[in-house]
Amino acid sequence: MGRWYSRPVLFVQDLDRARRFYVDQVGFSEAWSHSEHGQALVAQVERSGCELILTCQWPEKAGSGLIFISLDFGDMPAVRRSFERAGVQIEDGWWGYPIMIVQDPDGNQLYFPGQSAAANGTR
């Protein structure tokens, strides 16, 4: 059986604002974008193999996304510091283990599991 692959779609109201957040503050790079009639509608951002598709095509769905992003745990303190330096608001949460929660400008949430998730075998 072949390897499965997914790219989650996050619905946003303002694609340019979302791209600035993910690229300038969260450290993603833009892989591609699609425009029609001079308006950007879809963009893909990526960082370390994590790919997200951002779209403003269905604004009524904006803010309803939740993405669980696993990092190498040794990277977590550095990632947190880089987010804080870039002005990203971080909330500490709990999902059976500590998580770091980041919310984009549209309310989509990114969950980053904490150190004890590996001990629980949930990474």
Predicted ranges, named:
Residues 1-19, 66-69, 116-123:
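N-terminal beta-strand motif that seeds the catalytic metal site of vicinal oxygen chelate
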Residues 29-32, 54, 88-91:
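A short linear hydrophobic-aromatic micro-motif
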Residues 37-41, 62-63, 95-98:
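Short acidic/glycine-enriched loop/turn segments that link adjacent beta-strands
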Residues 49-53, 107-110:
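Short, charged/polar, Gly/Pro-enriched secondary-structure boundary elements
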Residues 2, 9-51:
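Core segments of cupin and vicinal oxygen chelate
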